[in-house]
């Protein structure tokens, strides 16, 4: 069953009550976004503003979209990943008046069809996750460019794409790299990805992590979190990295560091978090142990190269939900989780609510910042002002009952002076 109207396209609109329960549940653990929602409800900063979003459509993102709607915005949304949509949550959004077009398991053609439908509101602001919507506007929906004030981007992968657009001088409007805010990458990328990736792997496999060799490919903030939590679960952690500085940092953090070919021979579980293509490919599959498990924590399903796996396999099956078994000619079996897509969102519920509270507070404030400042911003990639980062941190600390120290006037003067020495 699929329910489609001009205002939404969802799997089953009757699932809305269950979706609303999920949204209500996570909202209780998102005090910063609650604070911003109350502010938006009072001030209506988005009255008359149209906002289109491409996000993982699950309960936390739903609360963000409803917060923007509470601020007076007309909101539309489509999925940023074909397999991360939660159909009951999407139904709830439709019932709440968000123009939403997403079905879990949608085809690639439907993915872009739904994104185009979300763009049909002719947005002033875009909220993106992976830069697909911004890219689509610049390639196939150029008629919308003059009405777009700016966009915000949630992910490392998306920011990389957008900086490439800026470098090539094709970016037509300002973009806020929310991913590059301290309150995003220090918490979401590290603690959020670290916990939710292992949540997805363990739900998909029901296997023990302790005692296994875990290979983490990429040691950015996401890789750091994945490695940290793997160690906490009792694994021996091996990091694969191309950046010599990050590789050295991983070694100083206590992890083994190897090339991919070396790690492929001994790994039990492989997790990619690079934002790049073909990080695990044929030459590595050929070296892996029987029973090796692979999962991806990067945005797109290109880090573990499935075409090579399919060519090597003599038989492909699904022994469990979200687990694909590739049987090779020599009898070895390799397992790919979540079809190589984001394991934390496909096989689990994504990041914890308390983490996304901070990230989505930044997204809400980024939309407000674009609305208030777009006339003076140039078509390039920006980072949110530090005061917004600090505001989110202070509200979060208050919600946790934590008081921090304040500088005295004497200390402030000392820090601003150059005259005090030895």
From Swiss-Prot:
Pathway(s) this gene product operates in, as recorded in its UniProt entry: Amino-acid biosynthesis; L-homocysteine biosynthesis; L-homocysteine from S-adenosyl-L-homocysteine: step 1/1
Catalytic activity: S-adenosyl-L-homocysteine + H2O = L-homocysteine + adenosine
SMART domains: AdoHcyase, AdoHcyase_NAD
Similarity comment text for this entry: Belongs to the adenosylhomocysteinase family.
Binding site for substrate: 129, 154, 184, 188
Function: May play a key role in the regulation of the intracellular concentration of adenosylhomocysteine.
Domain of life of the native organism: Archaea
Cofactor binding mode and count: Binds 1 NAD(+) per subunit.
SUPFAM superfamilies for the chain: Formate/glycerate dehydrogenase catalytic domain-like, NAD(P)-binding Rossmann-fold domains
Top-tier EC class: hydrolase
Native organism: Pyrococcus abyssi (strain GE5 / Orsay)
Localization per record: Cytoplasm
Disulphide bonds in the chain: none
GO MF term list: adenosylhomocysteinase activity
Name this polypeptide is given: Adenosylhomocysteinase
Lineage of source species: Archaea, Methanobacteriati, Methanobacteriota, Thermococci, Thermococcales
Annotated EC: 3.13.2.1
GO cellular component, as recorded: cytosol
Cofactor dependency: NAD(+)
Transmembrane residue ranges: none
GO BP term, pick one: L-homocysteine biosynthetic process
Assigned keywords, A-Z: Cytoplasm, Hydrolase, NAD, One-carbon metabolism
One Pfam entry name: AdoHcyase_NAD
Residues holding NAD(+): 155-157, 189, 218-223, 241, 276, 297-299, 344
